[in-house]
């Protein structure tokens, strides 16, 4: 039984389909790290991870310690990498829970080494290399090779992997992405020349997987990190138009009509006088608002699907509620409303909502609140 009259519906068959799409693209002997940060981009990290592991994922990737700990409580043996920054104060938690950490400096490695020695355990780490994102990482140069040698000499650490991140592989022209891979491959080869090897070497996110697996840029990679594509979205419109891989929508945002009321002509609906009734208006109230992830700016801008009919979202979206206009719509209290998701029901998908807000589907789905129950079908 639902605790609220609003929820996120997650299509598990589509999750499996999209993971299979990854497997069909990457080399047959490749390892796959399913990226499930931000509550699996809104799909629910525990259930999504369970499905990806069943389908053959070797690793899970998250952004922060709390996400990793949630997964560890359900998957005690699964390798989990924190792709984001881990403060030094988190070292003991990383070690005690057998979590892998991203490292980008000798100073941090030294602190983690000391903590590992105190606990008499080993901490697995992946070295981050900055090849052009200019966010975090060691530069791919001789100085960094010397730093890596020093990190390798530290006790208590197991350097399990090395990776970079592609910043623009979803662009129509792949020059920057290919230059990043050229720099990463050259650096890996320099390390190999000095007998420095790694169990895992990774660089390709969804954009890299969808667009760069046909060349030889990935010749030294053996681990792939799909993210947004697992949830049914292409990294960019350019990729959607040109990519032959079919991805299926996973996430739908739904709510029930909790009350229908007739509002006379000449009234304002909701906060701030943003919708004026120029006729007698049948208004449906939904228990869903911007605190749930339905952006406030969508008021008066989108249509939602009700019984395969389209109805406008009116007024400003409130923190916990919103309004739809039901004139000329066959609907009753308790009927389901699709805010975005299933195209077969005439609803917008998350990428179309994102376009209205000048953002991307990543933001539209990853900001869906945890207070919304996930319903798996």
Curated annotation (Swiss-Prot):
InterPro entries: Ala_racemase, Ala_racemase/Decarboxylase_C, Ala_racemase_C, Ala_racemase_N, Ala_racemase_pyridoxalP-BS, PLP-binding_barrel. The modification N6-(pyridoxal phosphate)lysine is found at residue 37. Substrate binds at residues 135, 319. Its cofactor is pyridoxal 5'-phosphate. One of its GO terms (molecular function) is alanine racemase activity. The keyword Isomerase applies. Its EC number is 5.1.1.1. Keywords: Isomerase, Pyridoxal phosphate. Pfam families: Ala_racemase_C, Ala_racemase_N. GO terms for cellular component: cytosol. Belongs to the alanine racemase family. Catalyzes the interconversion of L-alanine and D-alanine. May also act on other amino acids. This is Alanine racemase.
